[in-house]
Amino acid sequence: MRFALMTEPQQGLTYAELLDLARAAESAGLEAFFRSDHSGSFAGPPDGPTTDAWATLAGLARDTTTIRIGSLVSPVTYRIPGSFAKVVATVDEMSGGRVEVGLGAGWNEPEHRQLGIPFPPLRERYDRLEETLAIVHGLWTEPDGWGYDGEHWQLSDAHLRPPATFSGRRHPHLILGGDGGPRLARLVATYADEFNRGSATPARAREAFGRVAEACKAIGRDPESVVLSAMVGVLVAETEAELLDRVRLQREFFGEGGADADAWLAERRDRWIMGTPDAAQARIEALAAAGVQRIMLQDFLPRDLEMVALLGRLAAG
């Protein structure tokens, strides 16, 4: 099993706090550090700082040394595909080839409205996702002069300068996430290096992985060439007493302090890695049995660096 830390900087993190978290993950031995790509502050206080994903990833490219970095996921509604391809290639070069990129159709309508970004219906957002995937792949892998004629974007005589090298890879490690429905499964099979199933039980993750495998077979791709991962909420502690303290802090941050603690825990126990190390290890084993090869540990206590160190010890076995 491989492990990455997934963070939610829209919870009000400054760049300095994000860097502390990334360096803690690097010191803990986790293989990758991902951040969300949002423009509004949630959950928690609505007026906290919300840093730009790719601006901060450029900073992390220079301020970390070994850990892989990336977005999970960047909505295609936020950026023009050609410009996005160049941003990713630039940050990858800055990092020495450590960038991974997750792409998605976008879902948070209020964020779009607040910044004047169009938020089309779901079908059109998926159309734009598919065109974006075709364009960024083309810019990263096709020779100069390549063109693309889509409904939403057209390119002619395309070239990317500097040319993308990605440390000898044809393109950066590309992740698509979701529930693995038929259209998404087809896009994973066509374009992605990794499929990420978010917030699911092991049984539901296994079902989604099966749909991706069938989509790969349908186009003649080896299903084993797709990394299978899961994004899983995490809340762990060395002792039950410490765990309850972290539960209290998290509930207070989310404004759920008045909710029943037992009910709060019960609602998450079948989807999260939660508890003391023994309980957490059992959950990891259940995910592995479902076919998960990499876990994105979704951290909702981003200022608790001691928990990150504990996650590193769990990852090391």
Regions found by a protein language model. Name each.
Residues 1-317:
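Active-site-adjacent structural elements that line small-molecule/cofactor binding pockets in enzymes
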